[in-house]
Amino acid sequence: YTLSLHDALPILLIVALGGMFSERSGVVNIALEGIMIMGAFSSILFINIVQSSGAALPPQLLLLLAVLIAAAVGVLVSMAHAYASINMKADQVISGTAINMFAPAFAIFAARMIRSVQQIPFSNTFRITKVPVLGDIPVLGPLLFQNTYITTYLGFAVLAVSAVVLYKTRFGLRLRACGEHPQAADSVGVNVYRMRYAGVAISGALAGVGGLVFVVPTSTNFNATVAGYGFLALAVLIFGQWRPSRILFAAFFFGLMKTVASAYSGIPFLANLGIPNDVYKMVPYVATLIVLAFTSKNSMAPRAEGIPYDKGSR
């Protein structure tokens, strides 16, 4: 999967910000990878069905409808994690792992049952060759407004909205309170269970959309994988200290590493080194290990993250 930086960055931004909402509410969500797969599967299946039917929908409208479907399915899948974690007080890591294991198997099975194929094909007509006016801006035009997708800008929109919601709204204040001091939040009338469900639902919606955002620029079929971007988004979340502004920086760093790993052959200096292809593929994950080794000790995770809330305990 070859991605440019301006394609990889929105994926990591959207999914990491989704994880932020869940974990800020106090629920660990390592199911991001599985939710991405389910969101991508459902939305690509929708695109495949519409394109196969011959319906004359404008490409960008079709893509936006697919985004809504990916978000809806992401919410639906995340509710299974929310119920297990919040109501049943199950181990949140185990619950997330179960979804990660279930999603690719289900996607392959459903694709075979519904379309009689393992890989769901679609026609990629969504690329925007050039944004009028903006595409003519020197330097920035070719970088951001040529040969791009509408989903590229979605990542930055999600970043702006997330920052406002988290720090400038009553909802954001209550969400953060439930992740830090749920008993205190409950004592002033905040429904901790409801807020945690909301956090996980937002997380699921964004992760589902992130799955679609991954598939559209990389391929013309979906084969039940998102190349580990869900796990990489968790590293972005931790490195970004659960804060939108820092998550942007972390997403840029890891997106750059992922881009180098997938497009090194187009960089003359790296291509001439004679280093095996597999070594470059390791770069983003080795970088993840190194960064987390140096930053995890000082990470400021929400205090109640991963701790099931019991209304009767104080």
Residue ranges of predicted features:
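Short, small-residue-biased leader/transition segments that mark boundaries at the very start
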Residues: 2-9
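Hydrophobic alpha-helical segments embedded in the membrane of multi-pass proteins
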Residues: 10-20, 34-38, 76-79, 179, ...
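Short loop segments and helix-boundary regions at transmembrane helix junctions
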Residues: 24-28, 77-134, 168, 227-228, ...
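Alpha-helical transmembrane segments within multi-pass membrane transporters and channels
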Residues: 56-104, 160, 253, 258
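Transmembrane helix-bundle core of multi-pass membrane transporters
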Residues: 103-168, 269-279, 299, 304-314
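Helix-loop-helix "hairpin" substructures at the membrane interface of multi-pass membrane proteins
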Residues: 144-222, 244-245, 249
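Cytosolic-side transmembrane-helix boundaries in multi-pass membrane proteins
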Residues: 180-194, 264-314
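Transmembrane alpha-helical segments in multi-pass inner-membrane proteins
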Residues: 217, 221-285
